[in-house]
């Protein structure tokens, strides 16, 4: 194993931070270590950690579980700060609201994008200040606006006249961000479509309405779509936002000081390309805005690769060369991302019960396999024609990159309780 791997369930994850990141003040270092910074788990270390959870029977009744790699979260924040050093992330809570994950992000300086009263309450319950929240839902129930005013969440988005009237009535001190619709989000994994964002011809009337209501429009927001593969979409959106700033100035409104560039980021090469496009567009269109605060609403960038899911094989059927397996999580649970987030999942065998001397079945013959979820719906099929070695009931299948829009959107259909899936925390120190 490369480095030490430990279970830290029950520990404040901020306690492992060894440096100040993104302007946050870290909590004290982990006991017996005051100098080393945590790093992502190696593949072998992650496997060893999962095997220890399984063999030590830390999971009751062989239930599915997640591992959250806190070192990966630290690494992702380092990548963000290197690529977009002047842009403060407001993590999109809807993507994955795991409390230890949110606490870790908070300790590293991230703020939070909440879309409902429940999400605001959840973030506040972690001891996070309301001034670190943007209520980034352009269409809110009046009761949620009243609650935001009560607890001091004073920044929100809007894209309609009716929203202006609701905010004027219930939270007139709230600062507003006009949500505009980017013209090019066709390459997003999950495009926003027509649901959100003011069209170009709607911008001036909406600014006039907010001005007449004596509300402060502090800036502009947009979202190019979740998981967008085309970094050029940011170029057009940032140019359009600059046009809104200029329109507000022409109307004699208070100077806009906030630009929210939304989400859509994924880690790795795509982030390198996207961040370069964002920096270029900001330099081109906002180089003269000295008082500008730039924020973003990343979700999957931080969540996707930090979580790994372990599932148990609960059933098996052989039909000639075809192997069919049933596991105890599926499309109505964590793998709902296959349907709603257009995700592609991959599985690695962990033969804890049938082949402990060769856990990954390296060198073993593989078979075309189907993997079903546990519910009685035939739609609940996780993988088809997927090459897997011969596995047995009570072996495990491991799914990496399962942090974005997984457990958060799962259901309890057929009595399989997605919300009950436990998350184990781990981190490693460099060797």
Curated annotation (Swiss-Prot):
InterPro entries: Ala_racemase/Decarboxylase_C, De-COase2_C, De-COase2_CS, De-COase2_N, De-COase2_pyr-phos_BS, Orn/DAP/Arg_de-COase, Orn_de-COase, PLP-binding_barrel. The active site is at residue 376. Gene3D superfamilies: Alanine racemase, Lyase, Ornithine Decarboxylase, Chain A, domain 1. SUPFAM superfamilies: Alanine racemase C-terminal domain-like, PLP-binding barrel. The keyword Lipid biosynthesis does not apply. Substrate binds at residues 340-341, 377. It comes from the Eukaryota. It catalyses: L-ornithine + H(+) = putrescine + CO2. Its cofactor is pyridoxal 5'-phosphate. One of its GO terms (biological process) is putrescine biosynthetic process from arginine, via ornithine. GO terms for molecular function: ornithine decarboxylase activity. The keyword Zinc-finger does not apply. PROSITE patterns: ODR_DC_2_1 (PS00878), ODR_DC_2_2 (PS00879). The modification N6-(pyridoxal phosphate)lysine is found at residue 94. Keywords: Decarboxylase, Lyase, Polyamine biosynthesis, Pyridoxal phosphate. Belongs to the Orn/Lys/Arg decarboxylase class-II family. This is Ornithine decarboxylase.
